Design a protein with these regions (language model features):
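Active-site residues of response regulator receiver
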Residues: 14, 58, 86
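The feature encodes the CheY-like receiver
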Residues: 20, 62, 90
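Charged docking surfaces used in two-component/phosphorelay signaling
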Residues: 21-29
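Short hydrophobic/Thr-rich beta-strand motif most characteristic of the beta2 strand and flanking loop
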Residues: 31-40, 46
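Acidic catalytic/metal-coordinating carboxylates
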Residues: 39, 65-68
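Short amphipathic alpha-helix used as the core "switch/output" element in two-component signaling
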Residues: 45, 67-79, 96
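Active-site beta3 strand of CheY-like receiver
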Residues: 51-56
Length: 115
């Protein structure tokens, strides 16, 4: 795969449609192209198909963890930055996410300035 660029869309991964839609709408208002995935397996499939400038992934989803998305990006040797987002965060989870390769760890609700 090619290197990611700002011309590539942002991938939003969240099992909750309301949150996914809100993040998509907010990012689109910022002038970004956005694609969404409903979980870990959907995200992996999309990552196989194209490059993304950024991946924003929920930490806890029914089919797995946002850390699995980070690990999959690492396995593909992509340089795509990943931010892990969660409503149930703690310091240990943040450290684990950052050690796995995420560039940021955000707690819901996230603000426009955080995006």
């Amino acid at each position: 795969m090619m290197s990611n660029s700002l011309h590539d869309p942002v991938l939003v991964v969240d099992d909750e449609a309301d949150i996914r839609d809100l993040m998509e709408m907010t990012l689109m208002k910022m002038g970004l192209r956005v694609e969404t995935a409903v979980g870990v397996e959907d995200a992996k499939s999309k990552l196989d198909e194209r490059d993304y400038s950024l991946v924003l992934t929920d930490m806890r989803m029914p089919d797995g963890s946002g850390l699995e998305v980070v690990q999959y990006i690492n396995e593909l040797m992509l340089d795509t930055p990943v931010a892990v987002i969660t409503a149930f965060g703690n310091a240990d989870q943040a450290v684990e996410a950052l050690k796995s390769g995420a560039f940021d760890y955000l707690q819901k609700p996230i603000t426009l300035s955080q995006l």
